[in-house]
């Protein structure tokens, strides 16, 4: 079973594996990997060939903030200092980034690449909905720069299965210009053991 894909070449040569069991070696990954399996039998006598195909898409555990499946109260902005040259900024109180169907049972924490020359605030990690169960939170302090990104980490309450994951931005006193977010990275039991 695959927990998270750590690396895949963006310049894929479309590798193929033939047979019932196989292994594909992959290089560094910047996005996601899509695996497709197809089976065609030979048929028999007057019976036609049978075919089946399935495809799955595996998300990297390192995600650009702007790759969110849904967003509110935030804008995609550009900067040479951001990884991938883009980040999410102009973040408002009660704004959020939503990532669809994240496998939560292996996540032990999340690292955020953030910066703030504005109001700062909190990032809440919520399960299933904007106001769903709180899994973790991190306080983003003002560091006086809009592009001096630094890493902050929060532990995540153990959860089960797959669910939509919401990163909700909070600052009731200063409702706009809270922070910028460049990327997020899910920490797992296996990544903790690597350190």
Q: Could you describe each region identified by the protein language model?
A:
Residues 1-195:
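Extracytoplasmic
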């Amino acid at each position: 079973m695959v927990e998270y894909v750590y690396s895949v070449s963006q310049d894929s040569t479309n590798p193929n594996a033939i047979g019932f069991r196989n292994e594909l070696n992959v290089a560094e990954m910047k996005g996601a990997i899509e695996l497709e399996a197809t089976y065609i039998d030979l048929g028999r006598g007057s019976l036609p060939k049978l075919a089946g195909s399935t495809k799955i898409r595996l998300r990297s555990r390192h995600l650009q903030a702007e790759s969110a499946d849904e967003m509110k109260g935030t804008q995609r902005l550009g900067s040479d200092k951001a990884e991938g040259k883009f980040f999410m900024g102009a973040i408002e109180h009660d704004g959020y980034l939503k990532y669809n169907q994240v496998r939560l049972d292996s996540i032990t924490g999340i690292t955020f690449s953030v910066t703030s020359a504005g109001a700062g605030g909190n990032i809440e990690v919520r399960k299933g909905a904007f106001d769903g169960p709180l899994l973790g939170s991190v306080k983003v302090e003002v560091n006086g720069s809009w592009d001096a990104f630094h890493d902050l980490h929060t532990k995540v309450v153990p959860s089960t299965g797959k669910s939509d994951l919401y990163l909700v931005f909070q600052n009731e006193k200063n409702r706009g210009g809270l922070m910028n977010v460049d990327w997020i990275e899910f920490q797992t039991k296996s990544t903790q053991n690597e350190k």
